[in-house]
Amino acid sequence: MGPLEFRDVAIEFSLEEWHCLDTAQQNLYRDVMLENYRHLVFLGIVVTKPDLITCLEQGKKPFTVKRHEMIAKSPVMCFHFAQDLCPEQSLKDSFQKVIVTRYEKREYGNLELKKGCESVDEGKVHKRGYNGLNQCLTATQSKVFQCDTYVKVSHIFSNSNRHKIRDTGKKPFKCIECGKAFNQSSTLATHKKIHTGEITCKCEECGKAFNRSSHLTSHKRIHTGEKRYKCEDCGKELKYSSTLTAHKRIHTGEKRYKCEDCGKELKYSSTLTAHKRIHTGEKPYKCDKCGRAFISSSILYVHKISHTEEKPYKCEECGKAFKLSSILSTHKRIHTGEKPYKCEECGKAFRRSLVLRTHKRIHTGEKPYKCDKCGKAFISSSLLYKHKISHSEKKPYKCEECGKAFKRSSTLTIHKISHTEEKPYKCQECDKVFKRSSALSTHKIIHSGEKPYKCEECGKAFKRSSNLTTHKISHTEEKLYKCQECDKAFKYSSALSTHKIIHSGENPYKCEECGKAFKRSSVLSKHKIIHTGAKPYKCEECGKAFKRSSQLTSHKISHTGEKPYKCEECGKAFNLSSDLNTHKRIHIGQKAYIVKNMANL
């Protein structure tokens, strides 16, 4: 018997046979052929890539390849799926019955593997010459191995146990470089190319290189925009079958993988692998630019983009560009208004699944992210990260315009808007414009009158979650934020920041009209109204307008007759706190007069 070649494990179909297979069977055929080819490459048997493999990688039908291009003239072993013999069988059965034909000189043999056979040795080969004599022989030259899940075509040199290992979940092949384990030696061989930097396939469109031809094939769909796989539940189209499989779990809510350490259930094995590193502290993926390490390669990939200014993904609606296609997809929902992720508890919908997961913790009370400095817990890692900055005095983010420094990059981004007059976010109700989308969202609540955030202590409701968070502090006497200069403590970090300006004497907020400077931006905003003469706050009862919201609030009391401000000395009540303060001076004057008279006695 000669050396094993690719044609010895090639699977061939006629046009009629191919059309007998459904889509799932055709996809399985393609996967089997590509995997068999990879096995032979790993063993060093195949040097040049056969046309059939190129055809399959490009998504073409196998019968379009000419026979002489796919299979050479020398002896051939072909596997024919007996779909025409058993059309009523399922996908599983169609791969459990295989006809093996051996072409050699003037003789050929037919081998039929019945359902239930462990290998060809249990079947019979009928060898027949031109003399019509039949003779039963036992096959020894090749074997077809059957797994309980489905039949996989495999040569004696490819090790039939490979498929069974995949079903058991064992990963005996370990990478010496990084310790990652695999269930197939061929997958390990492909993985090693990551460490060696070996590149075998290059995209003709953008020049991007890959160490797997299958990765190149998948990558090409970015340029073509092809989305072959459609979700039957929501109609969403996806580029890859693996992405469709993962996507379907959103609808089913299935979480197959459970962490043995904390009991957390996850939808994907890759997510479980990365999650386990939270418990071990392992961070094997290191950025070669800044040295920062991560628990998964995907997080490292996203992080690396932060080192480049390239933004190849552009929104056709507004022209805004992004570094990641996933961010662009999420961004597009701003224009469409689509919010596909809905909370089953309260009905609130979100554009991103991550935001929904974080939101659900509000209902469950779960706060898995804990600060190791003060013990405070949070519903998301981003909130914990922001909180940790409050313990640090570092301000690494500096404004190039005015030199002001900030602890957070997001705060710097918001600050930069103050240097421009552009207000791209417009309210559809009143045409008021804003510099930030968050400010527009907050403003919209004015029109709806909705106050969805309620305090559990006193029942008071708020329009913003941030206002509720701030309000909750009023129920506690704890003052976490301490001034290093005078040891004065505050309940709010913002109050501490404002207080610090007293020690510095700095007035960073300057009016462009008159040059007057202020310690707070809010005071500057109120001051600017003097120059504009605008009175944006209008009373719904009488139509009177005011420059400040606080003035409107005070005015509204005149319609209700309410007098919430009471003098402790004489019991007299007032509409306004300012009126109470003025009234108190009467009592102070009386006391001063009495003291003066007593001194003269």
From Swiss-Prot:
This is Zinc finger protein 90. Its main location: nucleus. PANTHER family: TRANSCRIPTIONAL REPRESSOR PROTEIN YY (PTHR14003), ZINC FINGER PROTEIN 143 (PTHR14003:SF23). One of its GO terms (molecular function) is RNA polymerase II cis-regulatory region sequence-specific DNA binding. One of its GO terms (cellular component) is nucleus. PROSITE patterns: KRAB (PS50805), ZINC_FINGER_C2H2_1 (PS00028), ZINC_FINGER_C2H2_2 (PS50157). The keyword DNA-binding applies. One of its GO terms (biological process) is regulation of DNA-templated transcription. Belongs to the krueppel C2H2-type zinc-finger protein family. May be involved in transcriptional regulation. The gene is ZNF90. Residues 4-75 form the KRAB domain.
